[in-house]
Regions:
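N-terminal, active-site-proximal structural segment of metallo-dependent hydrolase catalytic domains
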Residues: 11, 30, 34-116, 132, ...
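Bacterial N-terminal signal peptides
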Residues: 17-29
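Short catalytic/ligand-binding loop motif for oxyanion handling, primarily in non-cytosolic enzymes
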Residues: 63-66, 108-111, 132-137, 191-194, ...
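Surface-exposed cleft-lining segments at the edges of enzyme active sites
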Residues: 72-77, 151-160, 188-203
Length: 331
């Protein structure tokens, strides 16, 4: 009897370590599978082949009033936030970015839009306390983990109309493999030098603050790739953008390996004009006419932009004057 007990005990001792190995494998497997691939891989408009991260950027036009402008009423249209919010939700769910950046994001629109996209898995990285953040970053919670977030409102107030000009920076870790990158979303001062002398230098100074912020981020997290996106209210050839390019920032459309949209990304949409596909920018092309930009700083040369696109779906024309920008890249 004693021998049989020993044999039985040995079997248990052998079995238990194998059981632990199997359980450990299952836990690791579940962990990997729960850290999903980019949501854009299953979106209506799927992630480009060989890309693994998607950024979607848009200035969504702050119209926080609860009245319909006469021009819109004459067109039989309604630009109020509760009407436009479902269309922005459609945009976001059609493309399902890992990272979403918005400008002119009012608290009024937040009440309408955020509940819609939160249920899709998006988290706002900085909800304002004292100051409302008009330039938020959202991330897809199942694929991304924030390591660092900062909001900065530009000063002095003369270059920051109603507190709307700011930047939000975020450092994100991809849950599936731990790779880290950063995104900075901004909206710069809007007037020309003719309207308000010093405006170009104000924008240049605001971008210098972003460049300093990027240096701080990279000092802390290493030479990670950084995307700077948003409505910069100036063309690529101007001093504000050229200072960034001189420091190694590259416009994403110029390095996209599979597709690069070259339109200026802007059209008529406002309370007084209604909406149309007419563009009033300085030029029809991106280099000379665009004011919405996406630049990449990648000193290691490991990040590849696959697609840079300007989304011109018909329904977007009457929800904002800025066509949304999309960047698919391989981290």
């Amino acid at each position: 009897m004693r021998d049989s007990v020993v044999v039985k005990d040995m079997r248990v001792r052998v079995f238990v370590p194998w059981l632990l190995v199997v359980l450990n494998f299952l836990v690791v497997s579940v962990g990997v599978s729960s850290a999903q691939a980019s949501p854009a891989s299953k979106a209506r408009y799927k992630l480009a082949e060989s890309a693994d991260v998607r950024i979607l950027d848009d200035n969504i036009w702050d119209y926080s009033l609860d009245t319909i402008p006469p021009k819109w009423k004459a067109m039989g249209e309604d630009p109020r936030d509760f009407v436009r919010a479902p269309q922005f939700e459609r945009l976001i769910t059609d493309y399902m970015p890992d990272v979403l950046t918005l400008q002119e994001y009012s608290s009024h629109m937040h009440d309408e839009l955020y509940p819609r996209i939160a249920k899709e898995g998006y988290v706002i990285a900085w909800e304002s306390g004292k100051d409302w953040n008009n330039t938020p970053v959202f991330y897809y919670e199942k694929t991304m983990e924030p390591l660092y977030v900062k909001y900065h409102k530009y000063t002095p107030a003369q270059w920051c109309n109603r507190g709307t000009k700011s930047f939000t920076s975020i450092v994100l870790k991809r849950k599936s493999d731990g790779q880290v990158f950063s995104v900075v979303n901004t909206h710069l001062w809007w007037k020309s030098d003719q309207m308000q002398p010093g405006s170009t230098m104000a924008r240049a100074s605001q971008l210098r603050l972003i460049m300093a912020e990027v240096e701080i981020i990279r000092a802390r997290f290493g030479s990670i790739p950084v995307f700077v996106v948003g409505d910069m209210n100036c063309e690529e050839k101007t001093v504000p953008l050229q200072q960034m390019i001189a420091e190694g920032y590259v416009p994403c459309y110029k390095v996209a390996v599979k597709h690069a949209d070259n339109s200026n990304g802007h059209h008529v949409c406002g309370p007084d004009d209604g909406f149309s596909t007419e563009s009033r920018r300085a030029a029809p092309d991106r280099e000379n006419g665009a004011i919405d930009h996406c630049l990449l700083l990648d000193t290691e040369g490991k990040t590849e932009v696959i697609v840079f696109d300007c989304i011109m779906d018909e329904y977007t024309v009457k929800i904002t004057d800025h066509y949304p920008l999309l960047v698919d890249f391989k981290l």
